[in-house]
């Protein structure tokens, strides 16, 4: 097996436990991996600002590392803040996505420099995004008119019972123009066509002069499936959705509440 030089980690349901914390064992495993020269990439659907606090908590702003945000829409260098990769959602799709969400009677959000923006600031799933990312909420009257600046993604929030139904309708309406896929039972991501974690990681590896055989990726959600299939070592958490486990090279015995990431890092990097 080729030496692992890059470790891509999904956050929610993978790196963090149910309390959105990184446990001491997992933190120690990551510190040991960094000491061996491994570059940590925090790979999330969250906006960049929603990943920065965790990156700082792990010391990546000083030790080095990257943030892959918006499900692959942007990658930054944690130490310098430099943008290494970015793809933005074409402005023409913002009003159509807002209209689609209204027709489906679900909430849609996006982000500004400060935090989360939506027409439905009391929506419990939108508030969950604020809590998870530690970002403030801004309520607006007309989201389509408000968004007059470049964005990397929009996010549909909805009751889990409706996720697959709304996802199917969205894929049909936007087929071949933008990509929609679930990142949790209550979130559907709307991103530029072709944006996914695997593609942006491929660009990062090329930038670093490395290949996919040097990448290990850990995740649990459907939006992690592409990077797990792409990586030289693809790891699905015990709590991962079944289609994710199906493409993984390894499924952890432990879930995200019991140091599943530490288990994988110890097995494949610190062995």
Please place each PLM-identified region on the residue numbering.
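Active-site phosphate-binding/coordination module
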Residues: 24-125
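Short active-site oxyanion
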Residues: 37-41, 63-65, 153, 213-214, ...
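Hydrophobic packing residues within well-ordered alpha-helices of enzyme cores
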Residues: 26, 51-55, 166, 170, ...
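Short, structured coil segments at secondary-structure junctions
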Residues: 58, 63, 71, 174-176, ...
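Asp-based phosphoryl-transfer active-site loop
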Residues: 3-19
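Short, hinge-like loop/turn segments at secondary-structure boundaries
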Residues: 57-61, 85-86, 125-129, 197-198, ...
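Mg2+-dependent phosphoryl-transfer enzymes with acidic/Ser/Thr/Gly-rich catalytic loops
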Residues: 2-6, 23, 189-271
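Conserved acidic, metal-coordinating active-site core of Asp-based
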Residues: 100, 104-218, 222-224
């Amino acid at each position: 097996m080729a030496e692992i030089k890059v470790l891509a980690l999904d956050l929610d349901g993978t790196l963090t436990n149910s309390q959105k914390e990184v446990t001491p064992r997992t933190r120690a495993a990551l510190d040991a991996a960094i000491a061996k020269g491994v570059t940590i990439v925090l790979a999330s659907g969250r906006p960049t600002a929603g990943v920065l606090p965790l990156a700082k908590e792990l010391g990546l702003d000083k030790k080095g590392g990257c943030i892959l945000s918006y499900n692959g829409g942007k990658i930054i260098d944690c130490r310098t803040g430099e943008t290494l990769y970015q793809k933005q959602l074409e402005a023409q799709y913002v009003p159509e996505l807002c209209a689609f969400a209204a027709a489906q009677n679900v909430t849609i959000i996006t982000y500004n420099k400060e935090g989360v923006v939506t027409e439905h600031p009391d929506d419990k799933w939108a508030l969950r995004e604020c809590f998870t990312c530690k970002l403030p909420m801004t309520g607006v009257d007309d989201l389509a008119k408000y968004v007059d600046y470049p964005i990397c993604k929009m996010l549909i929030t909805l009751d889990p019972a409706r996720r697959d139904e709304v996802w199917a309708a969205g894929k049909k309406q936007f087929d071949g123009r933008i990509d929609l896929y679930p990142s949790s039972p209550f979130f559907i991501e709307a991103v530029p066509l072709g944006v996914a974690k695997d593609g942006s990681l491929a660009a990062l590896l090329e930038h670093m002069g490395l290949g996919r055989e040097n990448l290990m990726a850990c995740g649990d959600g459907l939006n992690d499936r592409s990077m797990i299939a792409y990586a030289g070592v693809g790891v699905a958490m015990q709590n991962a959705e079944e289609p994710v486990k199906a493409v993984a090279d390894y499924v952890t015995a432990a879930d995200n509440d019991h140091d599943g990431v530490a288990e994988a890092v110890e097995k494949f990097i610190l062995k």
